[in-house]
Amino acid sequence: MSDTEYLARAEAVLAAVERTVDAANDGDHDIDLERNGSVLTLTFENGSKIIVNLQPPMKELWIAAKAGGFHYRFVDGEWRDTRTGTEFFSALTDYATQQAGLPITFRA
């Protein structure tokens, strides 16, 4: 994957996360979303955070959550955890639901 392809795919992920948080905030959620360059910080009502950021040199996406730190690479059309193979949006859904205390579903 070229640098240009990586950036397009990775930025699409960040945009999808932003859209999901905006929609969730229209409902029962109160999630603060801050974007600083290629870093998204989601802050939940209980003060816990999830950070999603791009890692261009490695062509990866990273998630930092209470559950730990996770690295994702684009494989066969999806962002997959480099250790477990878990799909990015599925994992983010699990981490955010745990930290928010309310269900929230992330999709591409």
From Swiss-Prot:
Native organism: Burkholderia vietnamiensis (strain G4 / LMG 22486)
Keywords from the named record: Iron, Metal-binding
GO BP annotation list: iron-sulfur cluster assembly
GO CC terms, sorted: cytosol
Alphabetized PANTHER family for the sequence: FRATAXIN (PTHR16821), FRATAXIN, MITOCHONDRIAL (PTHR16821:SF2)
Family as reported in the entry's similarity comment: Belongs to the frataxin family.
Molecular-function annotations in GO: ferric iron binding; ferrous iron binding
Protein name: Iron-sulfur cluster assembly protein CyaY
Function (record text): Involved in iron-sulfur (Fe-S) cluster assembly. May act as a regulator of Fe-S biogenesis.
Domain of life (superkingdom): Bacteria
One Pfam family, short name: Frataxin_Cyay
